[in-house]
Amino acid sequence: MLQNNEDDFSKFGDGSVPPLSRLMWRGGMPGLLDMPDQLISDFFTGYMRTYIERDVRSIAEISNLNLFSRFVRLLSALSAQEINSNELGRDLGIDRTTAVRWENICEASYQWIKIPSFNKNPIKRISSKSKGYFVDTGLLCYLQGIFSPEILVSHPLYGH
């Protein structure tokens, strides 16, 4: 049986911030737990540059990589919410088809996951929209401009 022992996480924080918040802010990518706080933002800047310039190019032909980058940031703001592709596209000046395709690219590259809605009523379960989530909480924090665990605990997305 697993036990929740806060002492197991104490080595990651200085005690001023709840340890879970620090872990959520850093995310789960390899090497980040030992990285100094001041380098986390640089890590994710490089990660996003590599993701967009190399990984996305190999998955799909996207003519405007800057617009796709804005799409990813907007998608991060919608984490834990129902996604309306029409509104998402309209906010960026792209059509619904492109918004759906780009969302699928984020899913195919393991940045984004859709979780079907749950309801005890099977009809409502089928008719309800799924919610989307960024897979890595550290990347989500970076994309939302959350640059410290202290900022995270007061952010509207905290706890969702």
Residue ranges and their predicted role:
Residues 1-3:
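Active-site phosphate/ATP/adenylate-binding loop shared across adenylate-forming ligases
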Residues 33-160:
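Accessory nucleic acid-recognition modules appended to NTPase machines
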Residues 5-49:
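Amphipathic alpha-helical "lid/sensor" segments that cap RecA-like P-loop NTPase cores
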